[in-house]
């Protein structure tokens, strides 16, 4: 979608797919909405639990159980390195999958965008990205926080859409990939801040 001109190109937009780590976006976005409303603060903490560690090797997984981790660190790990342990802790902090799915539908207006069931559709992800751009999801301050945090993801998470964009053009993206078994998928969703328009 060309956000400035209002033009769209839609191909298989309603075809559901397994989004991989793109499914981290709802819990991150809804947590930022809580920060935006004042319901939570970046300095609020949630204790590390062994049962919520995806790996003992990541930054959250290396911490002993009971460690008080700030929401700020969970969000940075979630967006910058796509940390699964951060996702699992934020999910439980938010009340679990059913709560998140209900809020995703009620607050973001999409039903096909979740970790469990692990399914999404291009038009759902696109709607959320478009609504964030248009200021319907966050206040300007927290929209900038979202763009800055997700936009600072490590280089290995910028091998899809950003790789095809000219240098100097800002791209804020979230990749999702599933390798092994019956699944081999690599997906990406992005907002591109171009010279004459934004997408």
Task: List the predicted regions and their residue ranges.
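Active-site-adjacent loops and short helices of periplasmic peptidoglycan-processing enzymes
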Residues: 1-115
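Penicillin-recognizing serine hydrolase domain
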Residues: 1-5, 63-65, 71-75, 86-199
């Amino acid at each position: 979608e060309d956000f400035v001109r209002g033009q769209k190109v839609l191909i298989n937009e309603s075809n559901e797919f397994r989004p991989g780590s793109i499914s981290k976006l709802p819990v991150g976005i809804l947590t930022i909405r809580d920060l935006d409303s004042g319901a939570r603060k970046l300095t609020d903490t949630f204790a590390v639990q062994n049962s919520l560690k995806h790996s003992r090797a990541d930054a959250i997984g290396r911490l002993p159980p009971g460690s008080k981790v700030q929401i700020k660190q969970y969000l940075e790990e979630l967006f910058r390195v796509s940390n699964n342990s951060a996702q699992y802790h934020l999910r439980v902090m938010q009340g679990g999958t059913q709560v998140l799915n209900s809020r995703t539908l009620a607050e973001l207006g999409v039903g096909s965008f979740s970790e469990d069931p692990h399914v999404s559709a291009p038009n759902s992800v696109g709607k959320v990205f478009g609504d964030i751009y248009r200021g319907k999801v966050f206040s300007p301050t927290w929209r900038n926080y979202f763009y800055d945090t997700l936009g600072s993801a490590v280089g290995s998470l910028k091998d899809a859409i950003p790789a095809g964009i000219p240098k100097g053009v800002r791209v804020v993206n979230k990749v999702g990939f599933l390798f092994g078994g019956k699944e081999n998928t690599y997906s990406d969703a992005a907002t591109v801040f171009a010279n004459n328009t934004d997408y």
